[in-house]
């Protein structure tokens, strides 16, 4: 070090200034890292919420068809028969039995139940037409919302029809067909043809190495035959692209042509003409109302057939179909049909479970925390209890479900030695009871409440206790009158956060039998019930595509419930801190 550096003040020393700049840059980088972490967390949260909301948007509305029923009786069977008759009558009363069956599937049998209840409540004159709005089936609802299959519409006015031949501009439909065939060729090449070639070449190399292996030769012959079949399919698709006229079947996109209120289905198509057959007969053709529908997904690959699409389009043209808020989502219990399913039974079950959990875990947890923090002697036994409470908070929730199923539902049978008898420990409670679910979740939440309450009690200054004791208060009075009021914001926050965690649990409830299908509202804590997280799990495993937005909607409702609980914790903390 030079002598000049020793005589320089520390604030002007170059080495010191260099280190200060480095420390300042490190501090600034750390702040940027913190802001980046917060931004990433918020971005992930927003992405999750937006994706769930986007998926659930279609679940909050449903389409209903307006019908005029000619009732013969008010029982459910007669009402459903009248609904089917009204649909078939409005659709032209087709003679084809298969078409009539497909039309009857546009509404669920459960729709008759709601109408029957309304009829029995209000009464009706059976001699007059009874107007009703009936929810369409889940697949029909998805089609009307544009979720079932891509549908392309073209103007077909000014057409010329001669028998089964219709002349119009079908160039737009032909472009869709060519694009669809090219996509099919690309899919077959990547998913079938290239893997089949690799398998054939691999077997060929093995056959060259072992020319006498008959089993290998048979496998090679089968692989070569598979390649030939795929090549034939590819050649057929390529020929269709170059053909001027395409023959249509159930394995190709459908072309439906509306002339007035009559509908025709194309069996072959070219750029300027189609040959069609009637789907549902209607009024005479009207050249001013022609419309071409190209349904991109083949009929064999979708769950809504062409006949149902024709009926829905005809009802829409007549103004019989309208979209309404899906009140069943909030007012109905679970159902096997998505259009009538709701979260009310799961929400009521969750409320019952959380009330039982709160009644057991909160007072016991706060009392245990007060004793351990204020009255318990500091010895090995107390330390052992505290360590095990911390360990219980880290146990997976499914273990508490196993404990609840073994102790509260099934019971533990202990054989008594030297005596022909057994001792039964626990058991006797029913599977799927909210009471059992509340007890299990109370055991799971108890360590969290104890830890949070002890932390809140420990944060109270010791001078408060000393001042109260100096004024002559007992230890119990000190805790009740001074310590607990000051610690109550932290205690309430920890308790509500623990309850919010409990309301979102699924695994413990599955193990105690709350996974059953519950179509009625539970009336008490000892009735079979389900919970909102379990309902979400059940809906997510059902095969129909209509359950996907329903599941997302139920997730949003559960998130709102948890948001309300967490908001309540914040408000109570702010109130008691004042």
Predicted region positions:
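Loop-to-helix entry region at the N-terminal start of transmembrane alpha-helices
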Residues: 340-357, 410-448
């Amino acid at each position: 070090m030079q002598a000049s550096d020793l005589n320089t003040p520390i604030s002007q020393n170059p080495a010191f200034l260099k280190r200060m700049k480095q420390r300042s840059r490190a501090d600034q980088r750390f702040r940027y890292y913190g802001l980046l972490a917060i931004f990433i967390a918020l971005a992930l949260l927003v992405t999750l919420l937006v994706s769930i909301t986007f998926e659930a948007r279609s679940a909050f509305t449903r389409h209903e068809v307006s019908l005029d029923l000619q009732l013969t009786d008010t029982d459910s069977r007669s009402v459903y028969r009248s609904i089917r008759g009204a649909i078939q009558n409005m659709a032209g009363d087709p003679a084809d039995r298969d078409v009539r069956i497909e039309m009857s599937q546009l509404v669920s049998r459960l729709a008759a139940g709601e109408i029957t209840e309304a009829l029995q409540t209000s009464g009706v004159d059976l001699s007059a037409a009874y107007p009703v709005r009936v929810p369409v089936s889940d697949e029909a609802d998805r089609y009307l919302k544009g979720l079932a299959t891509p549908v392309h519409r073209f103007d077909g006015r000014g057409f010329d029809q001669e028998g089964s031949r219709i002349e119009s501009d079908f160039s737009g439909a032909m472009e869709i067909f060519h694009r669809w065939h090219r996509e099919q060729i690309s899919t077959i090449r990547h998913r079938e043809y290239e893997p089949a070639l690799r398998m054939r070449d691999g077997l060929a190399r093995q056959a060259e190495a072992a020319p006498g292996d008959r089993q290998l030769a048979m496998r090679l012959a089968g692989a070569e035959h598979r390649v030939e079949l795929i090549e034939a399919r590819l050649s057929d698709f390529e020929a269709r692209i170059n053909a001027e006229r395409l023959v249509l079947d159930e394995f190709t996109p459908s072309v439906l042509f509306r002339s007035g209120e009559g509908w025709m289905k194309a069996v072959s198509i070219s750029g300027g003409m189609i040959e069609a057959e009637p789907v549902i007969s209607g009024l005479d053709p009207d050249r001013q109302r022609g419309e071409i529908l190209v349904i991109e997904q083949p009929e064999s690959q979708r769950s809504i057939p062409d006949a149902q699409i024709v009926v829905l389009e005809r009802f829409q043209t007549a103004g019989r179909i309208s979209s309404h808020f899906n009140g069943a989502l909030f007012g109905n219990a679970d159902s096997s049909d998505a259009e009538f399913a709701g979260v009310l039974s799961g929400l009521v079950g969750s409320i019952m479970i959380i009330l039982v959990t709160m009644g057991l875990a909160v007072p016991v947890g706060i009392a245990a925390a007060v004793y351990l923090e204020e009255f318990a002697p500091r010895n090995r036994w107390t330390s052992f209890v505290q360590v095990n409470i911390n360990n219980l908070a880290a146990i997976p929730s499914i273990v508490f479900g196993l404990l609840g199923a073994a102790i509260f539902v099934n019971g533990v049978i202990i054989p008594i030695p030297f005596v022909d008898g057994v001792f039964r420990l626990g058991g006797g409670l029913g599977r799927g009871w909210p009471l059992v679910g509340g007890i299990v979740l109370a055991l799971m939440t108890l360590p969290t409440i104890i830890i949070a309450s002890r932390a809140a009690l420990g944060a109270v200054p010791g001078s408060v206790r000393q001042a109260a004791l100096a004024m002559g208060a007992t230890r119990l009075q000190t805790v009740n009158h001074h310590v607990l009021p000051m610690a109550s914001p932290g205690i309430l926050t920890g308790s509500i956060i623990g309850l919010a965690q409990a309301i979102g649990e699924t695994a413990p409830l599955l193990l105690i039998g709350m996974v059953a299908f519950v179509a009625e509202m539970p009336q008490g804590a000892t009735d079979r019930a389900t919970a909102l997280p379990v309902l979400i799990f059940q809906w997510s495993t059902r095969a129909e595509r209509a359950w996907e937005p329903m599941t997302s909607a139920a997730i949003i409702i559960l998130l709102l419930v948890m948001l309300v609980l967490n908001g309540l914790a914040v408000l109570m903390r702010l109130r008691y801190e004042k």
